[in-house]
Amino acid sequence: MNFQEKLHSGKFVITAEISPPKGIDTDGMLKEASLVKDIVDAINVTDNQRAVMRMSPLAACSALRQEGYETIMHLTCRDRNRLALQSELLGASSLGINNILVMSGDYPTKGDHAGAKPVYDLDSVQLLGLIQKLNAGYDFSGNRLEGKTGFCAGAVANTEINELMLIKLRKKIKMGAAFIQTQAVFDTGRFCEFMDKIDPI
């Protein structure tokens, strides 16, 4: 049962997160992945997490898939305009990478290339809408594609409960988010409160 099938089955899903290497040697990443093999349903692969430059998540996911792992490729709006986002997604689909987690991305000043210019051509809600269009066989401008994608797109949410978070979450679900992931949770009471609050959504 793959990740998408397990989501639809209602069974409990377990994922782990791995950062691509800061370089071209994937041995360390693959060794990390081996520690959770047969334990997790998919491995999240970050996209320049905390604005620190690393190998493309597309290449990292491809390397992991060659070793038999199912992946969830992170894709941020920070570094790419709508052309580059679509190219990256089409490339991912052609390589069998069909699980995508979209997010805005940390601002570059937080990372190791403080002078980098952010893009943010689209926000995460618009990126989810873009993925819906690719799945329907069209690009963002409505032009027909040669073959359509089959992405299972997810989004992120902050467990800090406020009205703005709830509005954003509703928009993400409306735009096709099939799953929601949060940062690591250490306060179970707060997380239970978060789950109760979003349950009606």
PLM features: what roles do these ranges have?
Residues 130-179:
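Active-site/ligand-binding-proximal alpha/beta "capping" segment
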Residues 90-102:
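Hydrophobic or amphipathic alpha-helical targeting/insertion segments
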Residues 17, 43, 92, 172, ...:
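Conserved, mostly hydrophobic/aromatic
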Residues 1-6, 25-27, 51-63, 81-89, ...:
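Active-site-adjacent beta->alpha loops and helix N-cap segments on the catalytic face
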Residues 1-19, 23, 31, 139-151:
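N-terminal amphipathic alpha-helix/helix-capping segment at the start of soluble metabolic enzymes
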Residues 39-79:
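Active-site cofactor/substrate anionic-group-binding motifs, chiefly glycine-
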Residues 14-18, 41-45, 71-75, 100-102, ...:
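Hydrophobic faces of well-ordered beta-strands that scaffold small-molecule active sites
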